[in-house]
Amino acid sequence: MLGVTTYLTTDVAPFPLFWVLPLALYLATFILVFARRPVYAPPWMGRVLCLPALVLMVSFIIEATHPPAVFVALHLLMFGAAALICHSELAKDRPASEHLTEFYLWMSVGGVLGGMFNALLAPLLFKQVLEYPLVMLMACAFAPRVGEQRGFNRGDILWPAALGLLTLALVLAVQAAGSEPGRASTLAIFAVPALLTYRFVLRPIRFSLCLAAILAASATYVGAHGRTLLVERNFFGVVRVTQDVNGRFHQLVHGGTLHGRQHLDPARTGEPLAFYHRTGPAGDAFRLFNTVAASLPPRVGLIGLGVGALATYAKPEQAWDFYEIDPAVERIACDPRLFTFMSQCAASRLRVVLGDARLKLRDAPDGHYGMLVLDAFSSDSIPVHLLTREALRLYCAKVADGGLLAFHVSNRRLDLKPIVASLAADAKLAGCDREDFDITADERRDGKEISEWIVLSRRADLIHQLARDPRWQPLPPASGPLWTDDFSNLLMALRWK
């Protein structure tokens, strides 16, 4: 349960309320098998478990999570079947009434140990969320056996070995071509061994071992984000540094979300890419700031570090403060072997402040910054407390009169523009928005990504300067309830299409 909950709420559909669904399935299956008239897993339940497990194992390897609704349904179907099967085995082994107390005690101890493993040991043992696919394999091994397909024979060793070698050969053959694998070739690499594995669905041990062999062979697979150079896992999730297949960029990926990239060409390492491209809204916002910088404090605050790409906009006379909550991100961004934006920054003073931005920002004097950039909302799981009325009041207090607030609101799952528009209207701030969604194929190959930024200010004339560019549009009228420290509703921000 903890494994599927962690994976669902970090990689597939990062939405806090989704933890309720696996818990509900867990409790429902527990109630069914321990009821007065128990409902045990029927023999065909093994097929219900193994088919989605097969699809999900392949999706785990190739990092496929779209469309989210389909994958959420598959994960819940697999977990529900696994929970019913495992709870059925527990219920069938239930002892006589005089030993029930001990039975339930040890069952609870097992739950505690499993929770401790997931929470404490798994992040130390695994760089990825591997505890989930490993438990998935174990659940498939416990699936009910049907007919005469029982026992263990040499086929249970030879077939997994053969499928593992086949997968490895397919991976190496595609990568030897030297180009980024397309959807068809990626699917073929793992779909062929997976289809061969399904013929063993009536032999749970062999089926699980074949899946395990495919998973092991996939370690050499270069995924959608390229070759992995570094992986770190902590309380905040899994961050990876990758090099794209064509060897042009280093990239920072958190879960399944890109957080920045840098050219490896020494002549172009100083170019901001991805969501921070000079031809995008980030470039427009900093050009506007530089036109009025003489009348503002020469200090810029940024909430969210990423790879430090925004540091390329710094001027020698300026001081820049990055507020970052994840120490792993700070180590990666400041390591010149991975990214050099920070070491090349032209600012007279560059500082990274570790900790929660709202708490740390309180220590800055009022009116301290000429510009404050909020770049903490591109992940699928956003820090809601940075997007409330009280948070905006804090930002306004720390920015000088006439200064700028820039919100990076690019997000695959959430439409944050109406939320920011309501906050701006409540604070009586002028603002406009640019959706940079129509980028060319050449721009994408050159490292640019689609992005959306919102700029706010007390000075309406500055916003009017931006709005002279027709790509910058006024914010929509305030609608819906205002987010505060006491109220927020992610459902109203979800992109349902």
Predicted feature residues:
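Alpha-helical transmembrane segments of multi-pass membrane proteins
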Residues: 1-473, 478, 488-497
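Acidic/polar residues in short coil/turn loops that connect beta-strands
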Residues: 484-485
